[in-house]
């Protein structure tokens, strides 16, 4: 779902054969609009700056056999920097031990489980942590990696961006 982008996103996606859903700004609302428009038994929710790696779908079907589990990916950033590896490792540890994956780790969830937790929240930010909170005990990490663009971290700095993320979580 597009939340009012001003670049060529919609044009490029349309030319590639994608169906574009227009929604309001804010990830939660965009995700909700996409889910409503799509329908289906399972949803794979990804941020626009995330990339599935080659071979991701090999054997993927076995994870669709249990509607009571929502899955997220191991995170890796698109940067060779040491801080990219440190930040990605921390995100994976945080997700595993605290059950708090962020949206940049993706989410594979059955429609049945999504409905059982009253759907996705339309909040603009922290929709990922809100969903993780409601899915407590029903989340598991896939043995697959999702590549997320490191541009935001590299622009602001790994420590500053990380500190801002922690501050947002604390305020939430």
Language model region names:
Residues 43:
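Short aromatic/hydrophobic "clamp" motif used to bind/position activated sugar donors
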Residues 39-40, 104-118:
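Conserved nucleotide-sugar donor-binding
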Residues 1-4, 21-23:
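Short beta-strand/loop segment that forms part of the nucleotide-sugar
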Residues 12, 22-38:
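Glycine-rich, basic loop-to-helix element that forms the pyrophosphate-binding segment
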Residues 113-117, 123-141, 145:
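A short, conserved alpha-helix in the catalytic core of glycosyltransferases
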Residues 133-172:
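Hydrophobic helical membrane-anchoring modules
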Residues 54-83:
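Conserved donor NDP-sugar-binding/catalytic core segment of glycosyltransferases
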Residues 2-10, 50-51:
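A conserved acidic beta->alpha catalytic loop
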């Amino acid at each position: 779902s597009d939340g009012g982008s001003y670049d060529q996103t919609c044009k490029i996606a349309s030319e590639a054969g994608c169906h574009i859903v227009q929604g309001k700004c804010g990830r939660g609302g965009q995700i909700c609009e996409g889910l409503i428009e799509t329908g289906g038994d399972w949803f794979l929710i990804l941020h626009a700056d995330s990339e599935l790696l080659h071979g991701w779908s090999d054997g993927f079907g076995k994870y669709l056999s249990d509607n009571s589990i929502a899955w997220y990916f191991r995170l890796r950033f698109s940067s060779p920097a040491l801080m990219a590896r440190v930040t990605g490792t921390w995100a994976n540890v945080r997700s595993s031990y605290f059950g708090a994956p962020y949206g940049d780790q993706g989410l594979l969830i059955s429609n049945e489980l999504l409905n059982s937790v009253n759907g996705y929240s339309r909040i603009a930010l922290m929709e990922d942590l809100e969903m993780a909170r409601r899915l407590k005990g029903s989340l598991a990490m896939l043995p697959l990696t999702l590549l997320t663009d490191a541009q935001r971290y590299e622009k602001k700095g790994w420590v500053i961006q990380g500190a801002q993320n922690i501050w947002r979580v604390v305020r939430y």
